[in-house]
Amino acid sequence: MDEIQEPLALTVHLLADTGNGLLLQQALDQLLECICPEVRLFLVSERARPVNYHEKYHPRRARFPGMSVLLFLQESLGQERLFRVLDFLRRSPWQGFPTQHAQGRSCSYLPANQEFYSLHNQMPVWGMRPVNCGTDILRVTLYCSFDNYEDAIRLYEMLLQRDATVQKSDFCFFVLYATEGFSLQLSLKQLPLGMSVDPKESSVLQFRVQEIGQLVPLLPNPCVPISSARWQTQDYDGNKILLQVHPKPGVGIKNGEHPFLNGCLRGDTHPQDSSLNSVSTQRTLEPRSRRRSRSRRFKVHSLELPQPSGSWENSTDPLWRRLGWSTLADSSASGMQQRRLSIPIEPKMGRNVLREDGFEKLEAETNVDTGFTIINSEPRRSFPSRFPRDFQSSQPPRCLSGSSLEVTVSPNQGVFKDRLHPLSLPSQRDFGAKKVISKCSHHLQAQGEEKEEFFI
């Protein structure tokens, strides 16, 4: 009997322009098929309406892309696979990413002959590096500004409910999935003092959580619902985060109401019988006085939800009406009415996961940009069933901005031991006492060579 694996705690949603969703999803599936076919980490959705990045997001001095995806592939498994991965990355819709500062100066600290790629200038930057030993690693890296690094560690430890494995003082990672020959990691990298982060606006990190009412008062920025099961917020550096609520088994639902909504609307910000109770009192995620003004500066750009015909007007749920969520102005481009935060609560909305031969199969999935449920009765390779018919004709994106990249590898990189246990309360953590972990087969090794950690 095949072992049933739990769904990943993290999903990376990529928001594509209209008509490009199918093409980008196929490009990702094709690339990852030869590395980790059993893992479905990246999901592409199409935006409800296009965004003009040139007007909204202006280039700033010394800003680094906030997210990268790095592939560490074993040379011992054959160079043919390495060449195949590079061949995929050099084809459309992939584009070469310029490794230079916004002022046009090249980055002298980049490794020789290192190439970077991206599907869009507001999506993660991709890179590939061959390694001599250990396992294949797919590493999603978030780059943190110097002052926010330790707070970011506490935040993601709380969301993932596990401790970070510290490799050195400015780099740590979480192992999300591991087999004998493959490891999936989320890592945090501290940027040098004075360098700011350029968040990728078309990239959204979605975490599976069991309780939302306990998390909301601990988050550094406002957290608002975009559907009955998902909430949107940001981390300290502006990276978009979605929290998808999966209540614990046995939690009842009465009259179509979700228990986590009741706690939030009643103002139960200090729940009893919770491992996060002491944390909410001390607010350890906001240790400095500068956090006071962060909420005032932060503007919540909720994902807009197109109104389906006749589906929301019939909603009589008093919880949602009590919050006063109403319609937005009509979209000038499509003439279709947009509605924000007004989805009726249904007990079975969200992702229903089926298992087939140890492989995750999606029965129903909520579109990250619209909040609607998308039915998918096919496994990974049948992506078109997840999109409407007009998504089938897709064109590749063409715009890439000149953001700067830095790639270094830790000089003391060895074989590391990962630690996966339940969350230690942030108030009980002493980051000055974190120790370097060694001797594990899941992480990158260096054989007598001085390498720097992949780093923007």
From Swiss-Prot:
Subunit structure: Interacts with CHD7 and CHD8.
Subcellular location: Nucleus
Biased composition (Basic residues): 289-300
Native organism taxonomy: Eukaryota, Metazoa, Chordata, Craniata, Vertebrata
Domain of life: Eukaryota
Keyword rRNA-binding set for record: no
InterPro entries (alphabetical): FAM124, FAM124_dom
Species this chain originates from: Mus musculus
Comp. bias regions, Polar residues: 272-284
UniProt similarity note: Belongs to the FAM124 family.
Protein's name in the database: Protein FAM124B
Region feature (Disordered): 262-313
Main localization (coarse): nucleus
Tissues and organs where the protein is expressed, per its UniProt entry: Expressed strongly in lung, at slightly lower levels in heart, kidney, brain and testis, and weakly in liver (at protein level). In brain, highly expressed in cortex, hippocampus, dentate gyrus, caudate putamen and cerebellum (at protein level).
This protein's UniProt keywords: Nucleus
GO-annotated cellular components: mitochondrion; nucleoplasm
Family matches, as Pfam families: FAM124
